[in-house]
């Protein structure tokens, strides 16, 4: 089964998550981690912490190890991650990618912030006149600028590995793990 989870709930009830994983045979944990930076999580009004994100990853990593030791199919983490939010700085982006690299069997789904109308942050960006979007360009994986004030060249360089030393590992290798949800089900 595919389990859609919140990091704070995994961190709060690890024994329940462990039992549900074993009983329901969860093989994919879809977790909206969003960021490895507390500052960015707060900007998003995510109401979770970086520590809860790490605890969720660590628990699923333990479940992976257990399943492998027992000869069962190990679960994967399908992690939703967002970069390019208002106020994000390079170190915040590096922290998000470092967090993603902690996942033993992770499929990072990395997208750039899109200021969707109706969302609190999207409404604020639009009200501040920073949105470059029209409804025709509201896609999950944008290939063009969505917001004024974001250094999209930085993110392109980051994804190409030009900041690997600062991040501490090969970012293109992490990006190669990126996939779609259907891959987590096979």
Spans of features found by a protein language model:
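A structural motif corresponding to the C-terminal lobe/cap of the Radical SAM core domain
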Residues: 2-185
């Amino acid at each position: 089964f595919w389990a859609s989870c919140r990091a704070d709930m995994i961190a709060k009830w690890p024994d329940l998550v462990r039992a549900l994983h074993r009983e329901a045979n969860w093989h994919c944990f879809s977790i909206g981690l969003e960021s490895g930076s507390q500052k960015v999580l707060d900007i998003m009004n995510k109401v979770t912490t970086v520590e809860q994100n790490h605890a969720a990853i660590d628990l699923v990593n333990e479940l992976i190890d257990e399943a492998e030791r027992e000869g069962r199919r190990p679960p994967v983490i399908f992690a939703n991650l967002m970069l390019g939010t208002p106020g994000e700085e390079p170190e915040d982006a590096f922290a998000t990618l470092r967090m993603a690299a902690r996942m033993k069997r992770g499929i990072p789904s990395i997208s750039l912030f899109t200021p969707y109308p109706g969302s609190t942050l999207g409404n604020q960006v639009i009200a501040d006149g920073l949105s470059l979007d029209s409804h025709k360009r509201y896609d999950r994986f944008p290939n063009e600028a969505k917001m004024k004030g974001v250094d999209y060249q930085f993110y392109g360089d980051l994804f190409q590995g030009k900041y690997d030393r600062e991040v501490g590992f090969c970012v293109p290798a992490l990006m190669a793990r990126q996939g779609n949800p259907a891959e987590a089900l096979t």
